[in-house]
Every structure is written in structure tokens, then in C-alpha cells.
């Protein structure tokens, strides 16, 4: 039996990759080669990848396996990718490409941020106050730019905030900058049931009261601002502002409980920081 030509093997490999979940070694559209997976979440799975033509690394997000067969969600995935692409902000992870061949898995291509997530950093302990304030200021700058374009994140959390390292910072310049991941993508899951049991959009510890109530129709930029206050508290303490382990108790705490005492003055932190957190997490009666 004659051996199959290399071109035939490549075509067969590409066709096989289209039928199964993406994995390391796959080549997409003769442009991107997948390497190791970087992580997964409610929207999809992310791989480190290599741009074969430009010879540079990138990151690729695929739609979640349980969502890929839903035509409506594929359309929403494309729409949200387009929204995120338009943002173009130094503190928002850049979207550089989007592909959606009906016979394949839809995916978007992002810049690869070298560094660690805020979650990884907080596992080592609280941040120094100047660093915490600077990172949250960079987050606020990104939010202002996005909100002006009508794009709301809705799922801000330490896992979605990357601390990108600066190769050669100048004198007095910081060696890390914050980059926001998944801008615009969390909205696409609004009202979607992945597990068959209803699903709240947002991470429990960081969701706003309206998200905790399930009032997705009134979620707006203020929900992101609430999350900034919760994140600033955690940056300074390495503890969650709403610490109940039970989901329902935490939800009720977010919806209506009095904001826990911050005691920042006792910890030697400026009173202004406490005022900022209190203002961000102010409930509307």
C-alpha cells in the first residue's frame, strides 16, 4: 500500500481538527499553531499559540464546547468579539483576529500578556497600597474607555486582570501594568443556561447587587464600578470583602447586608481609600 502524501496527511489532520475539540499542535487556517492550554472559564478555553506568518506568540480563545453548537451564541460570540476589538486601550487585552468557519470552532485571537494574573499575585499576600491604587486606577481608565463605547465587562475578578511585565522600564516607571481580559465577552452568557439550572452572570464574590438579584436588564456601568471597590479592598487585604462561603448567604450579603467594617485607619491606610471603596460599593435604595 502506498504511503499517503504529506499534503493528504495535512488535509486529513485539518479535517480531523475541525471535528473535535482543539488541542495542542493543531494548526488553524494555516496561520495559528496551538501550543499549551492557558485556562478555561464559562465562555471558553484559552490556548497559547504561535502566529506562523508573523513569527510571534499570541493567545486564542475558543467558544466553550457546550456552546459551540448553538448558532445564536456563535453570533453573539462574534458580536462581542467585534465590540472588544473596537476598544483599543493600553489596559485592555487587544483582540487581533476573529474566525468563524461554520464547519469549525469559532475563535478569537488576542495579544499574549507575559506575567501573572492578579489572583496569582494575591495568593502571595496583599499589595502595597501605592501598587494597589495604581493598578485599580489603570482598571478605572480601561472602564471609562469601554463604558464610553457602551461596553460593560460584568465579570471583573482577579482572574480576569493580568499583570503584564514591562521588559525594560525606564527610570521611575512601573515594571507591571494591568490588562483587562474578556472585555465584552461575559455579556454573551446573559440568560444562557450551561448546566441546565439557571446561571447568574458574574463571579459571586465580585458581582453587584443587581447581578446577585438576577436583574440582568438593569446591569450597567455601575456594576463594574461596584466590582472595582470590591477588588481594591481585596488588593489591600488579600481577603474578600464578602467572605461567606455559602453561595446563597453571600448573595444575600451582597444584596442587602451592611458593608463590612473596613478598619483601614487602624491598618495605617489613608481614609481616602476607605471612602473610595464605600463610594464604589454604594447601593441605590
Region annotations inferred by a language model:
Residues 86, 135-136:
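Hydrophobic/aromatic scaffold residues of ePK-like serine/threonine protein kinase catalytic domains
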Residues 98:
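Activation-segment/catalytic-loop signature of the eukaryotic protein kinase fold
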Residues 137, 143-144, 159-162, 203-285:
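C-terminal lobe helix-coil module of Hanks-type protein kinase domains
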Residues 19, 69-72, 165-217, 245:
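Activation segment of protein kinases
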Residues 64-86:
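AlphaC helix of the eukaryotic protein kinase fold
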Residues 103-117, 121:
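Conserved short submotifs of the Hanks-type protein kinase catalytic core
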Residues 50-57:
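Conserved N-lobe loop of protein kinases adjacent to the ATP-binding glycine-rich P-loop
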Residues 35-42, 46:
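Protein kinase glycine-rich loop
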Amino acid at each position: 500500500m502506498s504511503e499517503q502524501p504529506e499534503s493528504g496527511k495535512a488535509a486529513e489532520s485539518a479535517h480531523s481538527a475541525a471535528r473535535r475539540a482543539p488541542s495542542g499542535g493543531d494548526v488553524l487556517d494555516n496561520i495559528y499553531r496551538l501550543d499549551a492550554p492557558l485556562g478555561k472559564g464559562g465562555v471558553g478555553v484559552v490556548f497559547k499559540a504561535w502566529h506562523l506568518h508573523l513569527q510571534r506568540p499570541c493567545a486564542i480563545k475558543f467558544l466553550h464546547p457546550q456552546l459551540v453548537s448553538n448558532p445564536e451564541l456563535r453570533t453573539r460570540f462574534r458580536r462581542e468579539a467585534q465590540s472588544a476589538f473596537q476598544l483599543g486601550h493600553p489596559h485592555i487585552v487587544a483582540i487581533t483576529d476573529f474566525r468563524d468557519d461554520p464547519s469549525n470552532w469559532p475563535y478569537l485571537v488576542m495579544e499574549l500578556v507575559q506575567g501573572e494574573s492578579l489572583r496569582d499575585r494575591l495568593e502571595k499576600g496583599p499589595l502595597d497600597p501605592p501598587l494597589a491604587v495604581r493598578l485599580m486606577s489603570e482598571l478605572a481608565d480601561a472602564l471609562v474607555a469601554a463604558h464610553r463605547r457602551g461596553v460593560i465587562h460584568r465579570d471583573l475578578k482577579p482572574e480576569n486582570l493580568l499583570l503584564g511585565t514591562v521588559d525594560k522600564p525606564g527610570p521611575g516607571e512601573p515594571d507591571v501594568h494591568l490588562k483587562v481580559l474578556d472585555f465584552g465577552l461575559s455579556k454573551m452568557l446573559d440568560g444562557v443556561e450551561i448546566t441546565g439550572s439557571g446561571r447568574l452572570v458574574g463571579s459571586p464574590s465580585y458581582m453587584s447587587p443587581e447581578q446577585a438579584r438576577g436583574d440582568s436588564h438593569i446591569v450597567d456601568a455601575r456594576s463594574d464600578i461596584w466590582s472595582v471597590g470590591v477588588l481594591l479592598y481585596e488588593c489591600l487585604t488579600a481577603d474578600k470583602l464578602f467572605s461567606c462561603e455559602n453561595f446563597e448567604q453571600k448573595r444575600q450579603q451582597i444584596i442587602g447586608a451592611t458593608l463590612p467594617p473596613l478598619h483601614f485607619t487602624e491598618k495605617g491606610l489613608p481614609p481616602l481609600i476607605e471612602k473610595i471603596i464605600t463610594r464604589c460599593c454604594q447601593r441605590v435604595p
